[in-house]
Amino acid sequence: AKQDLSIQVHPADDLAKKRHNSMGKTEMWYVVDADKGAKLRSGFSEQITPKEYKERVLNNTITDVLQEYEIKPGDVFFLPAGRVHSIGAGAFIAEIQQTSDITYRIYDFNRKDANGKTRELHTDLAREAINYEVLDDYRTKYEAVKDEPVELVACPYFTTSVYDMTEEISCDYSELDSFVIFICMEGACRIKDNEGNELKVDAGESILLPATTQDVTITPEAGNVKLLETYAVSYTHLPSPRDRTR
């Protein structure tokens, strides 16, 4: 982001269905890169009520009660529907999300466009959509393991793992009824499927594997490779990511 993005929230499925005949939006962030001092906002730093929320929006102090984090590459945030959030200037984020376009913009720092107009806000719609729960820490903690996938998020809408690798890895998707997306965040690798199709993937590129893919082999081109792997739903009956690789 070149500038701070708006403070916003997404509704959960039931509210989105009632209001928009749509699904809600749960998402996650993986910090690919960050300028020095770049920040993200996720959740509330103190307990507030819907009434106080409305007052703070009106007097431009809503950011005072949002939890703010100075970020670095590799940081992960899970954002279930209802959690207020925003991306700060200087943050380069890979975002995995539920398929939905429903966003309630709460606060946009009173910015105006070239015509002197402010952006539309949805503060009243957001009030009912917000989860006002306060957590001690909104970051997702994990420990990277070399040459093994590490699961970051598993929710009803998607599962995401990170690969930090220098050695070749094979992945078994024979029991997975979903497409798979790989996002290359660092280095370069070759991905070859069970039918012999092979493609080079460089940093900043993504590849989508169809649901018919049975297995793939990932071979680093040179040096260290970092990949995000994500698929559409959480299959709790499947082997863990580590058990699906060899």
For each feature predicted by the language model, list its residue ranges.
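Structural motif
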Residues: V84, A188-R190, D215, N224
